[in-house]
Amino acid sequence: MELVILDCHDLTAEQIVDYMIELNPDLRSLIKRQKVYVGVTGNIEERLNRHNAKRILFCARTASQRVAAEVERVAVARGFNIGKVTHGGNGTNSHSIYVYAYEID
């Protein structure tokens, strides 16, 4: 299956999270069960391979690292999982303009 990366460069972080939920009807149920991991990266294919993500729910390019980091913060506030991190994110760099979400096995 080819990875589809949506262009969300003209959306705010809140709009991107809303769009993610709108595109995936079963996402709310998965979030309630802590089964959706969300992250930010500069190389989306490498990161998804590293996570061994099987069911990719959302991939998008944002306008900037700042927007991508804000998407992660908003998603976490809405119940998405970011792993064993307590500070609200796994860190980003200036190339981290992609956001992704996948179903946790």
Which residues does each PLM region occupy?
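GIY-YIG nuclease catalytic motif and its immediate N-terminal context
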Residues: M1-D105
